């Protein structure tokens, strides 16, 4: 058979090489775990920027001898380095907080296949051996599951680079007793998903969660005759299209999610903003400690006075202590017209001396303040070779 079809023979060779690459990547990750254990004993920082840069430069030099492009080598190994860093961070956090890595029940929005489900699966893969799924219809249900002990963790989207803040989640954070214990960022690639053979001219109804509709509004404006139907999650939309088995309906969602429902990709959609990412946060009943060997982020919720310059005064406290704020979001205080709460993400460990001084000063000048959580930052900024 292979002698009659040389393409098949070549593909078999490529598949065999791919299997070897997977085995080597798994072996490399095991070594990264051992490196993490060594850093735990020697109390060294997880990230070693100089080592990462030297590694990339060496690999680029070696790659030239094999006619491999420097950009290709850099992109490939930046991803491998990121995996190594996050694997070591998870190891240090498990050790510090005595987390049982065996299993966890994680609540997320929607049935299987939603972006929240994919994010929960990604988080679980790095932190637990077994992931017990708990899909929910609404954000409030997710919070309730963890608050009442029905689930161990909640994974919820908090912001998107195209459509902005997820306001429903910010509003729930005002009143919850849960703490943020982790974060992750997911690349969002929307597709128009269908249950069988059809084309764009045949579609008349599209189902999805409001967020994908916002993020893909430029594409959707090309088809003004399409009826837009909102669902509680992208996976609920996919489920509806799979059950309908109609050439006239489609869902906006992920290709990975569509596969779970037997749907095909009719069109890959470019979102309004080309780089479309959603940041998710992980919530638990108990706050965690973050190792000083790991880059940390602290999220605060505060209400300032209504006098002029009150917010500026609070932000100056951060500047005076050399604390970097990476996000500021405001939300109305329900029941108090024209008053707002502010959410701040600060690039610092809650236990650091400067952060503690800043919290003391903020407590004196704000009407109220609450630490929503301190957690490892999973934003691994890639190192570029010189």
Say what each PLM segment does:
Residues 1-386:
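Domain-level signature for soluble enzymes in the chorismate/prephenate branch of the shikimate pathway
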């Amino acid at each position: 058979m292979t002698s009659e079809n040389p393409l098949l023979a070549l593909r078999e060779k490529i598949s065999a090489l791919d299997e070897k690459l997977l085995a080597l990547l798994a072996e490399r990750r095991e070594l990264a775990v051992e490196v993490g254990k060594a850093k735990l004993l020697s109390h060294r920082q997880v990230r070693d920027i100089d080592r990462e840069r030297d590694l990339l430069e060496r690999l680029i030099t070696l790659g030239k001898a094999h006619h491999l492009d420097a950009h290709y080598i850099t992109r490939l190994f930046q991803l491998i380095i990121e995996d190594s860093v996050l694997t070591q961070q998870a190891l240090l956090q498990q050790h510090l907080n005595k987390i049982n890595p065996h299993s966890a029940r994680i609540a997320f929005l929607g049935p299987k296949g939603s972006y929240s489900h994919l994010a929960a699966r990604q988080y679980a893969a790095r932190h637990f051996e077994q992931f017990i799924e708990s899909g929910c219809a609404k954000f409030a249900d997710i919070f309730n599951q963890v608050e009442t002990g029905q689930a161990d963790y909640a994974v919820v989207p908090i912001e998107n680079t195209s459509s902005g803040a997820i306001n429903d989640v910010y509003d729930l954070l005002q009143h919850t007793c849960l703490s943020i214990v982790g974060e992750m960022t997911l690349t969002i690639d929307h597709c128009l998903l269908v249950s069988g053979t059809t084309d764009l001219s045949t579609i008349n109804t599209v189902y999805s969660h409001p967020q994908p509709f916002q993020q893909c509004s430029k594409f959707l404006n090309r088809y003004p005759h399409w009826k837009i139907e909102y669902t509680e999650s992208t996976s609920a939309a996919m489920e509806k299209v799979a059950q309908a088995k109609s050439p006239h309906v489609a869902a906006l969602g992920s290709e990975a999610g569509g596969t779970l429902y037997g749907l095909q990709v009719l069109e890959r959609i470019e979102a309004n903003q080309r780089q479309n990412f959603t940041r998710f946060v992980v919530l638990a009943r108990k706050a965690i400690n973050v190792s000083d060997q790991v880059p940390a982020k602290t999220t605060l919720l505060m209400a300032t006075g209504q006098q002029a310059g009150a917010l500026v005064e609070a932000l100056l406290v951060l500047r005076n202590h050399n604390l970097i704020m990476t996000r500021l979001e405001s939300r109305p205080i329900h029941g108090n017209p024209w008053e707002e709460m502010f959410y701040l993400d600060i690039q610092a460990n809650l236990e650091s001396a400067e952060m503690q001084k800043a919290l003391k000063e903020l407590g004196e000048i704000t009407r109220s303040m609450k630490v929503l959580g301190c957690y490892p930052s999973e934003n691994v900024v890639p190192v570029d070779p010189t």
